[in-house]
Amino acid sequence: MIHSKIKIAFFDTKPYDRRFFDEANQNARFGFDIRYYETRLAPASAKIAEGAQVVCAFVNDDLSAETIRTLHDVGVELVAMRCAGYNNVNLTEAHGKLRVVRVPD
């Protein structure tokens, strides 16, 4: 059976983010297909995540109800926050559509 690589769309990334995640992704346990976007995640930018199973978002990204619906519509299954907070995530809208995880406090 052939397993395809998990595709991750990283939003609001800087060069230092890319270096860190690319280095970590070299580990044989990972090998994800990573796409980086400098733009922040918002309703207008959410469609560029199409084709990714996972979105990695940051503290200033907008995960409002509209963004969550768009991510769900384009096939995203998981939002991984690169921060401890998640007050920018509409968890009510995400329920039943996307899983949301974050770094521990």
Residue ranges and their predicted role:
Residues 1-52:
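N-terminal glycine-/charge-rich "phosphate-binding" loop or analogous flexible N-terminal tail
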Residues 52-105:
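Phosphate/diphosphate ligand-binding glycine-rich loop within oxidoreductases
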